[in-house]
From Swiss-Prot:
Site (Cleavage): R53, N54
Source organism phylogeny: Bacteria, Pseudomonadati, Bacteroidota, Bacteroidia, Bacteroidales
Listed Pfam families: MfA4_C (PF22358), P_gingi_FimA (PF06321)
Keyword NADP attributed: no
Source species: Porphyromonas gingivalis (strain ATCC BAA-308 / W83)
Similarity section: Belongs to the bacteroidetes fimbrillin superfamily. FimA/Mfa1 family.
Function (record text): Tip subunit of the minor fimbriae. These filamentous pili are attached to the cell surface; they mediate biofilm formation, adhesion onto host cells and onto other bacteria that are part of the oral microbiome. They play an important role in invasion of periodontal tissues and are recognized as major virulence factors.
Coiled coil: none
Signal sequence extent: 1-18
Proregion span(s): 19-53
Top-rank lineage group of the source organism: Bacteria
Additional note from the record: The name (minor fimbrium subunit) does not indicate the abundance of the protein, but is derived from the greater length of the major fimbriae. In strain ATCC 33277 and strain ATCC BAA-1703 / FDC 381, major fimbriae are 300 - 1600 nM in length and about 5 nm in diameter. In contrast, minor fimbriae are only about 80 - 120 nm long. This length difference is observed only in a small number of strains, including strain ATCC 33277 and strain ATCC BAA-1703 / FDC 381, and is due to a loss of function mutation in FimB, a protein that restricts fimbrial length in other strains.
Stated name of the protein: Minor fimbrium tip subunit MfA4
GO CC annotation terms, alphabetical: cell outer membrane; pilus
Length: 333
């Protein structure tokens, strides 16, 4: 009899414990929701580089503010949160954990289409404030009059999205923030016919020049299905008219070197042996973006002018320039 009483007592304890586990003080569906984010790596590719990932520098991963939009299942009625500090109306931002804790509960949230936008300027914020539907995000953009480095610079506009059922899990984990810009790196090794002793003025190579051709001015929060062109070049002069082209600078020769700029290498005799240029640019759906470089030739006296004058090297960029891609080229001229 004692054995049966002991068994009944143990069974009662287990049932009571089970009931307490299934009935916490606050119902599961009423717990506040959380969203964690991460900055996506660059996709690094190019003619002489295998496909790889690169997380980028600290400046390329920098987040200064966030704008959250939680649309309902139909893509409408967004709940919005603008975050500039650790606390904000409606929640808390934990930058070390890359996590946002919202006061909104699971039952209030339900299933949501969640968009996270980072590094929002005043113009983009005003446009996001007016967003009523998910499709409206494709109209929100930042315009840069000179869309290359140093005007396109950190902190970069980023965005990411996921659909999530907060009733099933109060944590939406790892929303990837993707930079809305691309990066181009061009490393040029010069053959002997271009290895001159240059005229250097304030660190720049006076005879070496370049220009960006058909770069797009618009940086979209969410890229339209087909992005319309709004193009500009860094100089109006078309080869061989290079007076207004940019002279080759030495910003990448400094230490620590910036993430974008121009640089060069001199040998022991003071001759230019290599050139380097790194710039950010906006995505494009149509081909035509190009980097043009004017290179002075060594004057060996065998040809009359202008045959030994500058030559043009043209690097066509990919037919489609994709956001968050790092295009790296190693070329010999």
């Amino acid at each position: 009899m004692k054995k049966y009483l002991l068994y009944a007592s143990l069974l009662t304890s287990v049932l009571l414990f089970s009931c307490s586990k299934n009935n916490p003080n606050e119902p599961v569906e009423d717990r506040s929701i959380e969203i964690s984010i991460r900055v996506d790596d660059f996709t690094k590719t190019g003619e002489a580089v295998r496909y790889e990932r690169n997380q980028g520098s600290a400046a390329e991963r920098l987040i200064t503010n966030l704008y959250l939009l939680l649309f309902d299942q139909s893509g409408a009625n967004p709940a919005k949160y603008y975050i500039t500090g650790n606390t904000f109306t409606g929640g808390t931002w934990l930058p070390d954990d890359m996590k946002v804790k919202l006061d909104m509960t699971q039952s209030e949230a339900g299933e949501r289409k969640v968009y996270v936008v980072a590094n929002v300027d005043n113009a983009v914020k005003t446009a996001l404030d007016a967003v009523a539907n998910e499709s409206d995000l494709q109209t929100v953009k930042r315009t840069t009059a000179m869309p290359w480095s140093t005007d396109i610079a950190s902190p970069f506009l980023m965005s990411g999205n996921k659909t999530h059922d907060f009733l099933a899990n109060r944590l939406l984990d790892n929303v990837p923030l993707v930079r809305a810009i691309a990066k181009v790196e061009l490393n040029i090794s010069l053959s002997e016919k271009f290895q001159i002793v240059p005229i250097i003025v304030n660190g720049s190579l006076s005879e070496f020049k370049f220009r960006y051709v058909n770069f797009d001015k618009e940086t979209y929060v969410v890229k339209p299905t087909t992005k319309p062109d709004n193009l500009i070049s860094s100089a109006n002069g078309v080869w061989p008219q290079i007076t207004d082209w940019t002279v080759w600078g030495a910003s990448l020769n400094t230490s620590p070197a910036p993430d974008a700029g121009t640089g060069y290498t001199l040998d022991a005799n003071g001759k230019v042996t290599a050139l380097r240029i790194v710039t950010y640019l906006n995505e494009r759906d149509s081909k035509g973006a190009t980097v043009e470089v004017a290179l002075p030739r060594v004057d060996d006296g065998t040809l009359p002018p202008p045959e030994f004058g500058p030559e043009l090297y043209r690097l066509p960029l990919p037919d489609k320039i994709l956001r968050n891609h790092w295009y790296k080229y190693e070329v010999e001229i």
